[in-house]
């Protein structure tokens, strides 16, 4: 593990699939969730008692470095994951949510080799190169399901006033309806 060799040229690689990493893929769970359809097609596991803890898979990156990950199926959620070795890969590659992992296999030769590469997401949010907020640009950030969601900014007081006006209009409308019904009700009682 970690050995560097002459990298396999891209023409000798056959693309298998890509996965945009999520916050949980690069977070404290220390695992990469492999989409089930790709896992079963490209990294099949034989269901035996001897490999209950998974198997070790070797992947070569674009620099010729070999990475070893434990690959297993979590029976509780029927999820396929790369675990042991994944957090080190994330750290060394500087992966962040939104980056893409590219999996490929050898296109030639009798041995089926596996390759892993990273494509960085170049948006400001993914690289941490956000510009400083100047006055008047303050935005509200809410964390929901592990994602930071920024508000559209704007003047919140306008929205609050619209809600207040909406309540007043509702009460006035309700009063008018009551007044309209009362005379008719009174006429019926006479």
UniProtKB/Swiss-Prot annotation:
<dbReference type="GO" id="GO:0003700">
    <property type="term" value="F:DNA-binding transcription factor activity"/>
</dbReference>
<feature type="DNA-binding region" description="TF-B3">
    <location>
        <begin position="17"/>
        <end position="121"/>
    </location>
</feature>
<dbReference type="InterPro" id="IPR003340">
    <property type="entry name" value="B3_DNA-bd"/>
</dbReference>
<dbReference type="GO" id="GO:0005634">
    <property type="term" value="C:nucleus"/>
</dbReference>
<dbReference type="GO" id="GO:0003677">
    <property type="term" value="F:DNA binding"/>
</dbReference>
<dbReference type="InterPro" id="IPR044800">
    <property type="entry name" value="LEC2-like"/>
</dbReference>
<keyword id="KW-0539">Nucleus</keyword>
<keyword id="KW-0805">Transcription regulation</keyword>
<keyword id="KW-0238">DNA-binding</keyword>
<protein>
    <recommendedName>
        <fullName>B3 domain-containing protein Os02g0764100</fullName>
    </recommendedName>
</protein>
<dbReference type="Pfam" id="PF02362">
    <property type="entry name" value="B3"/>
</dbReference>
<keyword id="KW-0804">Transcription</keyword>
<dbReference type="InterPro" id="IPR015300">
    <property type="entry name" value="DNA-bd_pseudobarrel_sf"/>
</dbReference>
